[in-house]
Amino acid sequence: MASGELVRTALYDEHVALEANIVDFHGFELPIWYSNIKEEHLATRSGAGMFDVSHMGTFRFTGPRVKEWLESVATQKVTSISDGRCAYTHFLDGDGYIIDDMIFAVVSEQEILGVPNASMISVMWDWLNDKLPVDNSVIIEDLSPKMSIIALQGPKSEKLLTSVLGKENHVGRFRWQQIMINPLGVSGWIQGTGYTGESGYELSLIHI
């Protein structure tokens, strides 16, 4: 990407077609609202709202002692998180100030996924790599360029999700699973997380 060039998500053309108000958000061309912020806030609180959060990053952590290592660099007790569960955590600097927050999704004892904030992808990449075990027992992969992330939030989000992707793709709060076979043929994973205060999902979709 050339310096100063804005990045477009896979849904950019859809946003334009829906006449979204698009702004520069941490180097991405993203919709800030469609009709107006108040209407969309209330729609999410009373029904469901869908958000393109593909500017967020995706890291994959793997290794035989990945839980112990992440527990040593994050505030969450990662060794207590069972497979298929998610947990919120922070990363702190030497003075105890927050560098970034992240939601971990535990795939297995040797694989964990995490989503850094858009403006912190490169910062967290460098910070985490600087703290990797010297024996190379933990590996970090940046999956961000290969992924789109859609947040579906609100009290009617379950009804909407199951009508489109099937009941087998519903997950409970702070649960994680691979996306099962579905009518749209999309693949990736889904977790029962979000930042709106409502129930909902975050879908990480692999680019075809």
Stretch-by-stretch model annotation:
Residues 1-206:
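Basic, glycine/lysine-rich polyanion-binding surfaces/domains
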